[in-house]
């Protein structure tokens, strides 16, 4: 029998954006319903995206570390693992994350509904369950936090057993010797690192002229060199004409006339917002061609009581930002305005092997803006801690204003880059004279640490001034 419920707010989706909104609302006394399509909370971030891919990367990087460390490699011992082996590690992490996040909802008395959500009208949502039954939920406010999914061109047969996207790759049931990755964005580059780390041949097909063009060019070049040095074949400025599935593999026909054959294909070229099926047309909302919704600074759509957060609104499409967007939307919903906002310089972490992380401006940005900047560099191979642990590939680069010494950008390539970046970010976020590269010279760091790279880079940069 269909039931009817009323809430202060309904949150559609339980990924980072939905969780941030739901927790922000219940902490302010709201009665909240959360609708999740799948049986487990966490969204794509937990089950198909961020968490499993980073768990896979960690397992592979530890294998590489063991095999390259002189303590072990001098004994002619090596270890190896298959993709299915390291998937077990990812599954354990996913289960831990799911239990923890379910606990958040339970402790905060969010009422959960496991089904597909669609609008009946601007304040009413239908929840359709797997058994075909329905419930009707009404609320004063609604948050759309449905995330995104891999883009699937109509002319690619994703039903073929050797053609995967970044969600279905976790269901890989065979052991490929050769993989084609179509799309050299963040996801494509991360999986190129994972497969190559497992000694799988990798062809990385890039539709652009260089890898991760939004990065500082030195970081992009460093990744390209590292891939080349480890045997990844990168094909720039290429697009597919046809993707042909065969009995035992895939052939990619490129518009340039080339052909590439491998055991399987990972298609990782773009994502689209999860808005189809929501019934947006019933409330007068329309997503763009990529399935994304437009919002204002308080994450309100064209309907002031309907909010949208996370990947479904596009940039920056980061789990960390989605959670903050959800909290800000919750505050705006309850108080009528948001006292906080996303920071201007959001750090990016790219979990290739080695990692890349950046915050602030690139050298290309500052040159185009005609800002008089200087560069301070530290090579990891010169740091005692890096030498001790055997991870001496990488560098830290600090960009700062020649006259004010204000830090303008920080770029790191190497193991633990995504952690190291936050030290510099904390100083960059200081107001006025608190943001200065001299902080790193005048502060005593633990020794030996990777954080010492900031002191080395600061001294290097300041020594360039005249």
UniProtKB/Swiss-Prot annotation:
Entry's transmembrane regions: none
Keywords: Cytoplasm, FAD, Flavoprotein, NAD, NADP, Oxidoreductase
UniProt: FAD binding residues: 36-45
Subcellular localization: Cytoplasm
This protein's GO CC annotations: cytosol
Cofactor: FAD
Catalytic activity: NAD(+) + NADPH = NADH + NADP(+)
Gene Ontology MF: a single term: flavin adenine dinucleotide binding
InterPro entries: Class-I_Pyr_Nuc-Dis_Oxidored, FAD/NAD-bd_sf, FAD/NAD-binding_dom, FAD/NAD-linked_Rdtase_dimer_sf, Pyr_nuc-diS_OxRdtase, Pyr_nucl-diS_OxRdtase_dimer, STH_gammaproteobact
Pfam families: Pyr_redox_2, Pyr_redox_dim
Swiss-Prot/TrEMBL GO biological process terms: 2-oxoglutarate metabolic process; NADP metabolic process
Enzyme Commission identifier(s): 1.6.1.1
Cofactor details (free text): Binds 1 FAD per subunit.
Family designation: Belongs to the class-I pyridine nucleotide-disulfide oxidoreductase family.
Function: Conversion of NADPH, generated by peripheral catabolic pathways, to NADH, which can enter the respiratory chain for energy generation.
Protein name per UniProt: Soluble pyridine nucleotide transhydrogenase
Organism: Yersinia enterocolitica serotype O:8 / biotype 1B (strain NCTC 13174 / 8081)
